[in-house]
């Protein structure tokens, strides 16, 4: 059985990003180009790399 990928509201996904099954991309999250997302990314996070790691949290104004 395959697991679904969940992409929440206002998330930005860069070109050539791979997202593994069962992963959730949080609301307002940004995933950098070419990243490989192996685990959940929280709301308001910027994640990049292989594997994708959170490098910054976006502050709400």
Language-model regions: role of each:
Residues 52-61:
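Terminal amphipathic alpha-helical/low-complexity segments used for targeting or macromolecular assembly
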Residues 3, 8-9, 14-15, 20-21, ...:
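Left-handed beta-helix
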